[in-house]
From Swiss-Prot:
Annotated GO MF terms: acetyltransferase activity; L-lysine N-acetyltransferase activity, acting on acetyl phosphate as donor; N-acetyltransferase activity; protein-lysine-acetyltransferase activity; zinc ion binding
Stored Pfam families: Acetyltransf_13 (PF13880), zf-C2H2_3 (PF13878)
Protein name, per record: N-acetyltransferase ESCO2
Provenance organism: Homo sapiens (Human)
GO process annotations (BP): chromosome segregation; double-strand break repair; hematopoietic progenitor cell differentiation; mitotic sister chromatid cohesion; post-translational protein acetylation; protein localization to chromatin; regulation of DNA replication; sister chromatid cohesion
Protein encoded by which gene: ESCO2
Chain intervals for the UniProt region annotation (Disordered): 222-243, 282-315
Amino acid sequence: MAALTPRKRKQDSLKCDSLLHFTENLFPSPNKKHCFYQNSDKNEENLHCSQQEHFVLSALKTTEINRLPSANQGSPFKSALSTVSFYNQNKWYLNPLERKLIKESRSTCLKTNDEDKSFPIVTEKMQGKPVCSKKNNKKPQKSLTAKYQPKYRHIKPVSRNSRNSKQNRVIYKPIVEKENNCHSAENNSNAPRVLSQKIKPQVTLQGGAAFFVRKKSSLRKSSLENEPSLGRTQKSKSEVIEDSDVETVSEKKTFATRQVPKCLVLEEKLKIGLLSASSKNKEKLIKDSSDDRVSSKEHKVDKNEAFSSEDSLGENKTISPKSTVYPIFSASSVNSKRSLGEEQFSVGSVNFMKQTNIQKNTNTRDTSKKTKDQLIIDAGQKHFGATVCKSCGMIYTASNPEDEMQHVQHHHRFLEGIKYVGWKKERVVAEFWDGKIVLVLPHDPSFAIKKVEDVQELVDNELGFQQVVPKCPNKIKTFLFISDEKRVVGCLIAEPIKQAFRVLSEPIGPESPSSTECPRAWQCSDVPEPAVCGISRIWVFRLKRRKRIARRLVDTLRNCFMFGCFLSTDEIAFSDPTPDGKLFATKYCNTPNFLVYNFNS
């Protein structure tokens, strides 16, 4: 059959189109299994033509070795189909195990060839094979169908029986001479292979904390590498400075001659300074650099000369180590030179310090001013901001729960304290159109004494009065001013005394406070004066002030303290008055030199 069938097919060999159609129907995807790479559509057309010619001529060449067709030397690719496979005498279907074996054999062949021809293969790939991009590296991993054939190259299939098929193949690759491609080919010589093509491993980017750790390690390595080089350069610079002092002097002289006409005036001074510096260079290495001083003109010229040579830039570090703190006050013109970067850094640091000082000053000024920030939103509510209770007189913030709680407590206690119920045998000593004054003695009933104690506690809290044990508690007299609303709005506690001290008047200067603003501190004389009545406490309810309640209480005291006698202002004294009490005593006595007692000396 093998001898007869080619003759039958040879008769119809002139009909290439029908033969090609027949082979395509018989083997629908010969190129799908064995074609991996193809450059363009033109190569695909050449492939079909070469296959047609091969099918026609293969009938005459059935007795070849290995039953494989010879490659057409005119075409860039070999035929992918043999006569044996065409007549179904060889099984072309490969199960997954057989495919795995083929891949392993192919990889071993490639490894052995690479070991034998390591250097020439690398050079050949450097010249001929261009570097594939990421897109081309990703595409071979997809399904190898006819849809992707124009993007891949055509390679002859490898059989299990023939392991030397790579030697029989002839692959034509374009030669592109590029340095970048050569470099990438060398780097990727040991890269992993996918479908017998070398690809780059996917770049993994370090993320999170690993990125910063890697960066720090690289910086440390670079710093360690740079340290020996810096030490060598510094040593070389120091050697050049020690050996060539005369050369630097000559260079500076030539540079001074090139300066603008303004510097020509300072040329003679510069020469003298440079000669003295070169002669005393060794001595200045031992001495302190801060002993000598340099004129401002020489320093300016030295700044211009600092740009002339690199040797003069490094002399600061070697010759004058102490001048690094304040290089302006360095020993000589040679030692006082600084580079442009150091000068810019010093100027920038000075400007930065000035800016920080200005910011600190502005911040202190802002904090010294009273802040007027609105801490509560005004949404048109009725109770907003600081409010004054009409009953107890406490100032509180209505929207603050803490203030409201404190107000409720104080309000309840205050109302209980000033509330006056009255009793039958009360002692009324004076009556007015807006109230009356009631006198309470120590021998009165207990409910009256209890009421006096409540009022006294409230008065002591408001005045900040220091509790003092009275000398004669049985002779204390308490005067309460009761308003028409049945509330205690004024209180005066008096006790008998024998002597008091006169308050010394203070000189009123242009900067001293006015008479309406009385200071807390006051002075009194050491000479005691006789007195009869001492006012221990006098208090008026906050909302009832400026209604002459305190004056009426003192008038009643002067009239009722001693039977049948009206006391003068020189016979009454006040105990350690507050600023408001001092102002009241000054107005009531018509003199700032009133009498005081019971004070802490």
